[in-house]
Amino acid sequence: MNTFLEKNRNVKIAGLAVAVLMLIGSERVTAQFKSSSFVPYSSVSVGLGTSSYYGEMAPYSRPLISTFGMMRWNVSASYARHFTPRFGARASFTWARISGDDYKLNNGDRGFPINFARNLHFRNDLKEFALTGIFKLIPDSRSYDRRPQWSPYIFAGIAAVAHNPVARIPDLDGDRWVKLQPLGTEGQGSPGDYPKAYSLVTLAIPVGFGVRYKFNQRFDLSAEVGFRFTTSDYLDDVSKNYPDPNVLKDDLARSMSNRSAEPTAARKGGDRTTGLRNFLTQQYGITDAGIDPFVAIGQTEYATPGTLRGNPARNDNYLLGNIHLTYILGSPIKCPPLK
């Protein structure tokens, strides 16, 4: 029970932020509808930017390298309705790629030797549909053409995210990427005390801030940073324990579940010999230079069934940074009534 509460604490905090923002917005809407001074308007935007993943392969304890070490891209499109001078709502679609690699982030003197030994990697193309409320710190004037030159804002909402993590198979089997969820790399769906396969759709709570610059009467340029708290610990296909390899469905599932004995890092290549020798020395006191480290790792208790493969106490999350080009649709012209 404590693990469940700890794991969902961030989502609850983010949910509270959403509720507060929506409450502020609802009060503003009520106040503004009592006045006819502001003319609501709409806008459409396209954007591109960066994406960073946080999880088993990119821990919060190393914020800089986790944010920038495996930074990838995102593209987005959105529609927004501005109801009052301060409050608006936005519907958006974002395609974001996230990625992680134990070898890259833990090779050499940096990082965690135990993560280097794990030798997992992944990439995941996220398809996010989000509904967010926007609160402008500097209010608009009564019409869109009189909006301020600079307008900082905060936002929060809810999102549905479709995902499907993949990884490159060992180099001896050829250069191709495979979907990880059907393999059940932690025993998902196998007989015995194993969980069912994880869902490829998850909920997320987007929260963030940005600043909008009025380029001219119809166009804005904005910069935005938003963090996504998700309800999934499987964006990277890593969460709990190593399974009994005998329950996995085939050799491919076994090779993708435990990659500690691979001589080469599969995602981009790279000799793992020195790093694995260092891990065996630090963790198990194995110092014999004549021992093959890729054989020796299999003779230790590392990655035995039931030992930790991930961190089940915390879900995976991601951060998006965006530049948006926005076109103001304006408001319909109100014709005087015919008499």
Protein language model features and the residues they cover:
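Outer-membrane beta-barrel biogenesis signature
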Residues: 27-45, 141-149, 304-309, 332-339
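Extracellular loop and loop/strand-boundary signature of outer-membrane beta-barrel proteins
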Residues: 60-66, 115-122, 141-143, 190-197, ...
